[in-house]
Amino acid sequence: MTVASPALIRIAAALLIDSEGRTLLVRKRGTQAFMQPGGKIDEGESARAALARELHEELGLRVHPDAPAHLGRFQAVAANEPGCQVQAELFRVDSDEQPRAAAEIEALAWVSADETHDMVLAPLTRDVILPLYRDLLSAPR
């Protein structure tokens, strides 16, 4: 008997960091888990272009597709799609521009590395991105 692999959802996500070293987490309407801003990569679209599009649609931020630093490709259980995995192209975006919740975003939260213990977090955010964020903040410059 073969076991079907979970469906894979390709996304672009932003580790958005402000000048105070906080990162932005978002929660989509009708969901419980906070996660990085970003979204699905459309057919034929680059991860960078998808990130710029999603940041503009969801938060009103204008980011040139070449500006974010690519941090890697990561995979985890999807927070809002049962039986699916997300594969994220993660980019660091440094910005002090004030985001505003738009499209499907219901809540925004600027958090420091140690402020997330009481939040419901997406598996990718909790298990991969926030530990990476903490490492980035503690790395010597």
Task: Tell me what each language-model feature is.
Residues M1-L8, Y133-R141:
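Short, low-complexity, intrinsically disordered N-terminal peptides in bacterial proteins
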Residues T2-T23, K40:
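Conserved N-terminal beta-strand and adjoining loop/helix that marks the start
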Residues L16-I17, L25, R92-V93, W110:
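Conserved hydrophobic "DFG−1" position in protein kinase catalytic cores
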Residues D18, R22-E58, R62:
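Conserved Nudix-box catalytic region and its N-terminal flanking loop in Nudix hydrolases
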Residues R62-G72:
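A short coil-to-beta-strand element that immediately follows conserved catalytic motifs
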Residues F74-R100, L132:
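Active-site-adjacent beta-strand/loop module that shapes the phosphate/pyrophosphate-binding cleft
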Residues L90-R92, R100-L132:
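NUDIX/MutT-family hydrolases
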